[in-house]
Amino acid sequence: MSTVIAALQQAIHRYHIQHPDDDFPLLHHREQTLHRRFQALFFAPLLGIETLTAFDTREHPLLTLIGQGYHSSTLGQFLGQLERINAAEALMPALVPHQPGQVTYVDGHMIAFWTRVAMHKGKITMLGRIMAGSQALIAHNAVGQALFVEYHPPDRHLSQVIVAYCQKVVEATGIMLFVIDRAVNSLALACAFAQQGWGLLCMLDDNEHAGLASFDATLVDTHTDGTRVYSGSWTVPRHEDPRHFVIVAPAAGKLLVYWGTAKVRDLLEVSAWPQVYRERSEIQENSFKRMIDHGALNTNYGRKKILGVDRHQQRAQEQLDHALEAAQKRVAKQEKAVTTQQAKVIESTSKGHGKRLEQRQRTLGGLEKAYKDVQHKHDQLAAAAAALGPLGERADRDFRKQTIMTVRTLLLENALTSFMAVLLGFLKTPVSLDCLLTLLFERSGARLETATQVVYWVNTTGLSVSYHRLLAAVADGLCAMDLREQGKPLHVRLKTMPP
């Protein structure tokens, strides 16, 4: 947390220098005030608080936890002022650990946004609906630590923004090897990553190959279950294709084809590619589910919108313009063919041809029908283009508050991941993060601070014998971790409290 507060103080100082005439409360916050208010935002999801207004109606132990209670008006103002100083940019480096690793996993997460305003739309995967929303691109390292986040409108496909996004990740972390799902499976992106000197590990679609025969492959490994792993390139060389392939042929089931650029071959053994790719599920997809459950990842923050050109209409207009241009060429071609054939019919008529005249008239009839068809199609496209009218406007979300709160969520997830890794080293009984959060944050308790220690009492009323035993083991583990609060040793005790 000290790193976060230091980053915020630097952002405040920088803003004050750049805008010496501006004056609002955040610019004058003491370190303690800044620390407590950010802590309130940080711990809110663990207390079951997703939207800030829930601070006004939900009973929560914030006063016990950080020594100060807050309502939504105060925290809403605080968040608005963090937005004003562009705190998201300042907080982003706090996500990156000292040793970020050598592999970055990137995935997008769609969040629905309900509004009556005309906004750009995309497919919100978890709801299966086309609607307004936002797309968070989140990067994790190989141990599941979140590294970077950036928001985009939902109508922009991942492939359109991924190169610029990865450039920012490289600048922030120094990692140049990326593992991304089939949303970026294309030769163009493989070439783009290869030109940058980056590694990209992805999968080939099933319709892009005809099985093992499509590849000049060499057997590199055979698993105990009969699965064979091959490595190679296309059977028919494609000199413009920089991809190398790893093919997994299970004893039963379909072929799986992974591909990577030269950087991937330099950094990873080809036999390890399938396992590295499969770890996406736990590192990212399951992480998103956890952050939805206890990190408020799906909660929208901020109502500001930015008006701009209607990209849906713009794309439709561009498609119609291309189709209309092609239709005009077809009309001109058919018109020329009809004119040429009419001249032949006139020639046959003047020369008194019999059978040839019938043939040419029959051909002319077919050409005239084809001309009418292409002219009709052209008229339809022209009418559709005219119906679109002048280019309109649609709104996009202002993502500044959303980004700040998502960085908060990622910081929380990183802290919980590190905390669990340490705690499990002191426990003989395995426990999941969800179970631990339920035991500690969904039960009442008390906090006692003396001159020499801080004691947290957890209410055990209503716990079954097995869960009481588990909570006791967790309490012992927490005490063994030698945690400290403001320099004082922290102890966790269990106590049955009256209802």
Region roles according to the model:
Residues 169-177:
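Short, surface-exposed connector motifs at secondary-structure boundaries
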Residues 179-188, 206-209:
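Acidic, metal-coordinating catalytic cores used for nucleic-acid/nucleotide bond scission
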Residues 22-29, 263, 269-278, 299-308, ...:
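Short, solvent-exposed helix-loop connector elements
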Residues 1-130, 136-153, 159-164, 171, ...:
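Dynamic "connector" segments at or just before major functional cores
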Residues 334-385:
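Extended alpha-helical coiled-coil "stalk/arm" regions
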Residues 115-117, 186-193, 211-215:
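A short acidic (Asp/Glu
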Residues 288-349:
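Charged, amphipathic alpha-helical linkers/stalks
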Residues 151, 195-287, 292, 452-453, ...:
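An anionic, glycine-rich sequence signature occurring as long contiguous blocks
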